[in-house]
Amino acid sequence: MLPDGVADVLFEDAHKQEVLRHQLTQQLITHGYQLVSPPMIEFTESLLSGASEDLKRQTFKIIDQLTGRLMGIRADITPQILRIDAHHGGDGIARYCYAGDVIHTLPSGLFGSRTPLQLGAEIFGCESIAADIELIDVLFSMINSLDMSAVLHVDLGHVTIFKRLAELAALSASDTEQLMQLYANKNLPELKQVCQVLPMGSDFYTLARFGHDIANLLGRLSENAQQDTKIVTAIDELQRLKAHLQVQWQCAVSIDVTELSGYHYHTGIVFNGYINSETQPLVRGGRFDGMKSNQLATNQPRQATGFSMDVSRLLAHTQLDAPFIVLIDYDAFNNLDSAQRQLLLQQVASLRQQGYRVTMPLTAEDMPVGLTHRLSLADNQWRLHAV
C-alpha cells in the first residue's frame, strides 16, 4: 500500500514524464544553464540553513547510520543550488538548471503529490531586472516547446513594496503577520478596520484594494511612500515585466502585490504561472538571496532569481506522438537459420533507431500492449505491416 499523496507513475505516463524531463532540461542547457544533480540527502545544517519553517516541516529527517548526525531528505532542490553556487559560483553571473525527485512530509493542497519531480532554473550574481526577464523568457520557451493546449497565465508580485512599507511604519512582527494573514484571506472588511489603527494604515489597505492596478498604484499611496526609492523601483519593475510579458508572449498577466506566501524567503519580484483554471500554480519563481562564496562567514547575500515546477503536473496537458509497437512473428522467428537471424537483428536495430518499439517474443502468447505493427517473413523478406 502506498501512503496518501504517493503514487506510481506507470507505462505511458512514465515514458512521457521522462521525455518531458529530458526535453525541458535540454531547453535550459541550450539557453546556457549548467545542469547540476545534487544528492537526495544532506546533513540538515546545510540542507536547512536559512530555510523557512514551512520547508523545515516539509522535510523528512533521518539519522545517518555512519555518523549519528541528523540528515534531511530534500523537499526542495533550490537550497542545494545555493550551496553549490556558494562553493562553485564565484562572484560573476552563474546559471544553473536541475531536475530531480523531492519528497514532502505533507501534500500541497487536497490532492497534491508528496513526491514531485522538481525541475527549475536559477541565475545568481545579477541584480538587474534583466535576469528576471531572461528567466521568464526561458520559461515561456520551454512551455511553447511542448505544444501544450493549455494556456499559461502569470501572476506577478513584489514583496519589497509591503516589506518597505512595514519598515517605514515600524510595524511590529505581530502586526506584520496579521496583515499578511488578512491579505492571504482576502478579508477586506477586517483589513480596513485593522489598518485604521496602524501607522500608514491607508497604504496597507491600498495594496489590497488597488494593488492590481499597478499603473496607478504609486499615485494612490501616501506621499511618504511615493518618495521612497525602493517602493518606486519595485513598482517600476512590475510595470516593465508586465509590459514585456504582454508584448513578447501575448499572455494574460495579473498583479497581486499582496502575494506574500514567500515573504520570509523572497526579496523582490515573485511570480506564479497557472494553466487553465487550476488553482495551484504550475510554476513558482522569484528573487531570493544566495551566499557569496568568499563571504560565508559574514553572511553577505548574493542576488539570485529562479523558478521551479513539478514536471508530473504537465502530464495531463501534453501529448506525445503515438508509439509504433512492433511484434516479430514468433513461429517465423524460431525457424530461422543463423544467417537469416542476423539479417533480422539488423532490421530490428534499424527500426529501433527510428523510434519503433520492437518486441522479440519469448512465447507464442507473448504480445505487447498496444500493438500497432507486425514484422513477418514473406518471400524471404521481413515486412512491416500495420495490424
From Swiss-Prot:
InterPro entries: aa-tRNA-synth_II/BPL/LPL, HisRS-like_core, HisRS/HisZ, HisZ
Function: Required for the first step of histidine biosynthesis. May allow the feedback regulation of ATP phosphoribosyltransferase activity by histidine.
Compartments (UniProt record): Cytoplasm
The protein, known as: ATP phosphoribosyltransferase regulatory subunit
A GO cellular component annotation in the UniProt record: cytoplasm
UniProt-recorded Gene Ontology molecular function terms: histidine-tRNA ligase activity
Record bears the keyword Amino-acid biosynthesis: yes
Pathway info: Amino-acid biosynthesis; L-histidine biosynthesis; L-histidine from 5-phospho-alpha-D-ribose 1-diphosphate: step 1/9
Main location: cytoplasm
Additional detail: This function is generally fulfilled by the C-terminal part of HisG, which is missing in some bacteria such as this one.
